[in-house]
Regions:
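Acidic donor-binding segment of Leloir-type glycosyltransferases
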Residues: 65-112
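Membrane-embedded multi-pass helical conduit in multi-pass membrane proteins
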Residues: 292-374
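N-terminal membrane-anchoring/stem segments of glycan-assembly enzymes
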Residues: 1-41, 334, 361
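Cell-envelope/extracellular polymer assembly enzymes that use nucleotide-activated donors
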Residues: 45-48, 77
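Long helical/loop segments within the catalytic core of UDP-sugar-dependent glycosyltransferases
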Residues: 100, 104-112, 117, 121, ...
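Short aromatic/hydrophobic "clamp" motif used to bind/position activated sugar donors
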Residues: 122, 134
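Catalytic donor/gating beta->alpha subdomain of glycosyltransferases that bind UDP-sugars
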Residues: 162-164, 168-184, 219-285
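Acidic donor-binding/catalytic loop of UDP-sugar-dependent glycosyltransferases
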Residues: 138-154
Length: 381
């Protein structure tokens, strides 16, 4: 007669319980709210779109046209702010502006070398904007269709002062990077929907010119070279006045980032995040989301190894079941959550993408520790 020891019962119960907790404590179970498909008012307010460029002639040639071909019932302007030394880009913009009344371009002087040129470009673009509502984006992005502006601006009304849009990475981008971007969106966009916006990694942000000018733009963050979208949301988001637009017609498509651009974005975040407020609750939530899946994985593997060593086949079966339960549940939950945003990410790779996050984060921290910290400051202050 087979007897089941107390150790087997307790260890088996613990690993199964941890597998359940490790599956349910999950950012992909905290769903995002999607806007009702019913359209709001047919009319729209005039709006300005700001694109900041630096050595982005190729991207502008491929992406700018779609910004200029939006079907929009009111006037809109696309302001491209480049640098005075970028002669080829200025020549291209001059030709395009002659053909399209929506396009306006300007540049920052070469002498602006002791402050963040990116933030100076944005500030100059805001001052040049004719309209109250402004959408800020990048030359490496393009609208998914000609309804982008119309769909994005349905939120540009009272009581909103900030609108966060979604940006999908081009399908040529590595699956793990597309996964990481979507996972961050579940934290950051949901946070903006529920309370205060914390930051955004997606360059599709609408804000009010009057707010930006009244609060002196990037004052408080000028010492950092980048972090312009993070700080914009962190400074200007208030409780209840931030909208999130997830309709696929409002998406922007981001060109495949180079390895350098991808890693630099993480390095600049490491440098500038210390200036962001409202970070504690986000960090605590993310820590819990990492702790329980990894604790469950380690417990299941350790129990499985122990059970095999002790030839406790009942416990071996329970530990194996707990391990499979954890991996299958997390994979199914992640796949169901992200398929709205990207249905091309392999379901078989999802467990590796999820459990690789802490190692990718560690690699980013090591790169930052080894980097020259002066590279992240403008030396202005």
């Amino acid at each position: 007669m087979m007897t089941i020891s107390l150790t087997t019962i307790i260890a088996g119960a613990v690993v199964v319980l941890l597998a359940i907790l490790g599956s349910l404590i999950n950012p992909f179970l905290r769903s995002l709210r999607f806007t009702d498909e019913e359209e709001s008012l047919e009319s729209r307010e005039p709006i300005s779109v700001i694109i900041t460029a630096h050595d982005n002639l190729y991207e502008l040639e491929h992406n700018l046209q779609m910004f200029l071909q939006q079907k929009y019932p009111a006037d809109y302007q696309v302001i491209v702010v480049c640098q005075s030394t970028d002669g080829e880009t200025l020549d291209y913009l001059k030709r395009m502006a002659a053909e399209n009344p929506h396009l306006y371009y300007t540049y920052i002087p070469e002498s602006s070398r002791y402050m963040s040129r990116k933030k100076l470009q944005i500030t100059l673009g805001v001052k040049a904007a004719k309209y109250e509502w402004i959408i800020l984006t990048e030359p490496t992005c393009t609208p998914s269709n000609d309804k982008w502006l119309y769909t994005m601006t349905r939120n540009c009304q009272e009581p909103n002062h900030l609108v966060l849009g979604y940006v999908a990475l081009d399908e040529a981008t590595k699956g793990v990077r597309r996964f990481d971007s979507i996972r961050k969106a579940f934290y950051l966009l949901r946070r903006a929907q529920l309370s205060y916006g914390y930051r955004t990694h997606m360059p599709n942000v609408a804000f009010r010119k009057s707010d930006f000018m009244r609060e002196q733009g990037y004052q408080g963050n000028l010492e950092y070279v980048r972090g312009e979208y993070d700080f914009l949301v962190n400074k200007y988001a208030a409780y209840g006045d931030t909208a999130v637009e997830l309709d696929c017609d409002a998406w922007l498509i981001h060109d495949e980032p180079t390895d350098k651009a991808w890693h630099n974005a993480h390095l600049y975040l490491q440098a500038s995040r210390k200036s962001l407020t409202r970070a504690k609750s986000m960090k605590s939530q993310m820590a819990m989301d990492h702790l329980f899946p990894h604790l469950s994985l380690i417990a299941s593997l350790a129990t499985l190894a122990y059970a095999i060593l002790m030839q406790d086949w009942i416990l071996t079966g329970i530990a194996g079941f707990a391990l499979l339960l954890l991996l299958i549940l997390r994979t199914v939950i992640a796949h169901k959550a992200i398929k709205h945003f990207d249905d091309d990410i392999s379901i078989l790779k999802l467990p590796f993408y999820e459990y690789g996050i802490i190692w990718r984060n560690l690699a980013n921290k090591i790169r930052y520790w080894r980097a020259d910290k002066n590279d992240f400051t403008s030396h202005k202050l």
